[in-house]
Amino acid sequence: MSLLVVAPEWLTSAAAELQSIESALSAANAAAAVPTTGLAAAAADEVSTAVATLFAGFGQEYQAISTQLSAFQQQFALTLNSSAGSYSAAEAQSVSILDTLGQDVFGAINAPTEALLGRPLIGNGANGTATSPNGGAGGLLFGNGGIGYSQTGAGIVGGAGGSAGLIGNGGAGGTGGAGATGGAGGNGGWLFGSGGIGGTGGANALGTGGTGGLGGSAGLFGGGGNGGAGGLGISGDLGTGGAGGTGGFLLGDYGVSGAGGDGRTVPLEVVNVTEPVVNVNVNGGHSTPVLIDTGSAGLVMQVKDVGGPLGLLRMGLPSGISMSAYSGGLTYLFATYPTTVDFGNGIVTSTTGVDVVLFSIPTSPYALTTWLNALWSNPLTTPFDAYFQSAGVDGVLGVGPNAVGPGPSIPTQALGGGLGQGLLIDMKGGELVFGPNPLTPEFSISGAPIATLWVSVNGGAPVAVPSIIDSGGVMGTIPSSVIGGSTLPANTNITVYTDNTMTTEVYHYSTNDYQPTVISSGLMNTGFLPFWNQPVYIDYSPAGTGTTVFDMP
C-alpha cells in the first residue's frame, strides 16, 4: 500500500500560481489575435493572397487551441483548490480524532493517580489561576510543573511554580502583587530536570519592592532555578533578589540569585559589635555567613558549606593544596577549588579560587580550650568551627590586596562590570558595597591592609609602626616596644595617625575601654575600631598594594 503525503497549503499556492499564469497567457493571446489572424496580402496577385490566407489560418488555429488550453487550465486550477480544501478538511478531522484519542488514552492512564494523589502520571501540571495561584504538579512519571499565577492584588505573594515528578522541569513562580514576594520556582524532577525560576517581586510605587522568589531545586541531575528579581521600589532600586536553587545532587549547576537592590550592595550584619559578616553561596551549598576580613586574602570555607563531599566532586580537581594559620592559634590544611561565589542580589563572581578546609588543629591554649568546650555539646565540632563560633561565622572572606594569604585569589576581584575594583565596608550603615567608592573620602593610606601608621602614647612623639588595618582583628594587637612594657597600661590614651605630622588622626582609644593584646614582635593590628568609627573603602589600586580609604562618617 502506497502512502501519499499532501500539504494543503502547497496545493492552494500552486492553484494561485496557475491562475496567475493563465491571466498572463490570456493577455498575450489577446494581444496576438489581430496581428496573427488578420494578415493582409503583400500584393494583389494570387500568390500573395494565398500566402496571407494560409498564415492567417495558422493564427486562427492557434487561437482555437489556446481557448481549449485556457479552459483546461482553469478546470485544473479549480480541481487543485478543491483538493486542497478536501485535504484540509480531512486533516482537521484526523487531528480532532487523534486529539480525542489522546485525551481518552491519557485520561485512562492518569485517572488512578489523579484520584489517589491529585496529579497525573504523565503530563504537565496546570498553570495557577486567581482562585488557585500555585502551579499544579507535573506527572509522577513525566511532565513539567505548572506556572505560578502572577498576582494583581497588592501584598499578595505570587503563586509557586509546580514541581515535576520523576522527569521534568519545575514551573516558574508567579510575580508578587505590589510590594509582595514572588512565588518560589517549582522543583525539578527527582531523576532529571531543572528547578523553576523564582517569580519577580511585586513593584511598589509607595515603598520597597517585593523580594524575588526562591529558585527551585533540582533532583539527581539538573540545574537549580535562578532566583527571581526583586520588584521595583519607589527609590528606583529593586527589592532583594531571591536565592537560587540547588543543583542536582549528582550533577548540575546551582541557580544564582536574582537581581536586587542597586546591583552592587548586599546587607552586612555586625555580630557582637566587632564582626562584620555577610552571607555567600559557594557552589550551591547554602547561604553561609562569612567574616569580612581585610587582614587576609582569599575565601576560606568548610566542606559542609560547599555542598559536602559531593560538592567537592562537582567542582572537579583542586588547583592546589596548602596550609595556613590564624594568629589566634589555628592551623589548617586546605585545597583550592575553582568555582563561583554568589553574594546575593545577582552579584556573582566569575570562576575564582575558593579554599576548602580539609583538616584543622588548635595551636594555642585559647583555641584548644574553645574546641574542647564545644565538643561537649557537639562531638562533630571541628577546631575551625569552634574557633569562629563566637563570631557567628562558618568562613572567612579575606579582601586585603597586600595581605599575606592564604590566597591564591580574592573573590571580590573576580566580580564583573566594574564591581571588582574595590569594596566599601560600612559597619554602622549595615552595607557592603562593591565597585567604585560611593562616599566622599576623608583621607587615605597607601596599602591595604599592611601599611605604616604612627602611634602616639599620651600625646607623646609619634612612633612609626608597621601595621595591619584589620576589620577581622577584633581588639587588635600592639607591640610592647610602643608602650614600653609587656602589659597594657591602664588609663593610657593611644592615638594613631597617618604620618609623623600628627595632623590626620586614624583613630584613638583609652586602654580602659579598648584593650588590644600586647605582642613582643610582629605587626600592630588595628582591630575593628577604625571600621566602627567610619566607613572604610578598600581600593584594589595600585595592584598588589591597594589603598585604604577612610570616608566621611
Curated annotation (Swiss-Prot):
Identify the residues that the record assigns to the PE domain, covering every copy.
Answer: 1-92
Recorded phenotype for the gene knockout or disruption = Disruption of the gene does not affect LipY surface localization. Mutant shows moderate attenuation in the zebrafish larva infection model.
Organism, by scientific name, is Mycobacterium marinum (strain ATCC BAA-535 / M)
**Name the record gives this protein:** PE cleavage protein A
Q: Name one GO biological process term.
A: proteolysis
Return the Pfam families for the record: PE, PE-PGRS_C, PGRS
Compartments reported by the entry: Secreted; Cell surface
Active site (record annotation): 293
GO CC term (a single one)? cell surface
Keywords, comma-separated and alphabetical: Aspartyl protease, Hydrolase, Protease, Secreted, Virulence
Query: For this UniProt entry, which residues form the secretion signal?
Result: none
Fill in the PTM field for this protein: Undergoes auto-proteolytic processing.
Query: What GO terms are given for molecular function?
Result: aspartic-type endopeptidase activity
Where would you say this protein principally sits, based on its record? secreted
Family stated for the protein in its record: Belongs to the mycobacterial PE family. PGRS subfamily.
| Stored InterPro entries | PE-PGRS_N, PecA_C, Peptidase_aspartic_dom_sf, PGRS_rpt
Q: What does this protein do?
A: Aspartic protease that processes the lipase LipY and other PE_PGRS proteins. Can also cleave itself. Cleaves LipY both inside the PE domain, before amino acid 98, and after amino acids 136 and 149. Involved in virulence.
The protein's superkingdom reads Bacteria
